[in-house]
Amino acid sequence: MLESPHIPVLPSEVISLLQQTKNPNPQWFLDGTAGEGGHSKLILKTFPEAKLILIDRDAVMLERAKKEILKEIGSLDRVHAFQMNFSEVDSELLQEVGCPSLDGALVDLGVSLFHFLHSGRGFTFKNDEPLDMRLEANIGGKTAADVVNYSSVLHLKKVFWEYGEERWALKIANNIVQTRHKKKFGTNTDLVKLVEASIPRKFWPKESHPATRIFQALRIEVNEELVHAEKGIRALAQCLGIGGVLTCISFHSLEDRIVKWTFRDLKDNGPFEILTKKPILPSETEIKENRASRSAKLRGLMKINPIKESRWEK
């Protein structure tokens, strides 16, 4: 199947925030979620003298991003690529590539459209695929099938409620446990059918599939997305140089809540300033051109000089 060209979310808004860096000659940026390389290409074009640390936890996505950058920029000479989680970024990694500190960083917390349409890992409802959902499938770790087949009713209920905000969490969890005694869940289709049967049709959401919240919850659980989001935001904030900017794009309320609260905590307890009093949202035009952007929210944070002159000092 022919893939549609990738369109990065809030592209000009991300660049506008990164351009607020106080370094008049910015040298180092980091894209913590390379994805299809859309934002990375914009960063490299906007800052032609800068180098980019390119990170993605999915080896497939990292290679796709590098390929896209090479195609459009013509070279990977300014790119240092690593397969890892952005929550693992630290001063040692920066030292490894000769980076003293970051002038700007971006994390896009959404899952790539590629994962839903082409990964074959069970993120979608449309194709019959293994119930996997791992973003680091080449490294190992638990799958969505493991969670569904071996978790207790209470744990499943907690996952579905806390990560999916699913009102039918307990009923779905009970039905899963009853069903798996007869046959283990192996594919996404198995789970979709159970969720559809568990929720009365009159309560199905009008604008999304009834299994959307369950699949979101399992994906978050399998990949520990919210844990890594907070840890990663804190890690990248510490890697900023004075005047450096961190930008975060979120796609649902759980992610945005973590970004908002973590930014606020960093501001209250460290040398940071929030650049976005309210999240930046996509325009109506962007939403029409790129439906994937419709729930996106962008927030920005700057590291400031911790030494402030007292107003009483002369």
Swiss-Prot record:
Gene Ontology BP annotations: rRNA base methylation
UniProt-listed InterPro entries: RsmH, SAM-dep_MeTrfase_MraW_recog, SAM-dependent_MTases_sf
Listed EC numbers: 2.1.1.199
Listed SUPFAM superfamilies: Putative methyltransferase TM0872, insert domain, S-adenosyl-L-methionine-dependent methyltransferases
Gene Ontology molecular function: any one: rRNA (cytosine-N4-)-methyltransferase activity
Any single GO CC term annotated in Swiss-Prot or TrEMBL for this entry: cytoplasm
NCBIfam families listed in its UniProt record: 16S rRNA (cytosine(1402)-N(4))-methyltransferase RsmH (TIGR00006)
HAMAP family linked to this entry: 16SrRNA_methyltr_H
PANTHER family: 12S RRNA N4-METHYLCYTIDINE METHYLTRANSFERASE (PTHR11265:SF0), S-ADENOSYL-METHYLTRANSFERASE MRAW (PTHR11265)
Family: Belongs to the methyltransferase superfamily. RsmH family.
Protein name: Ribosomal RNA small subunit methyltransferase H
Organism: Leptospira biflexa serovar Patoc (strain Patoc 1 / ATCC 23582 / Paris)
Gene encoding the protein: rsmH
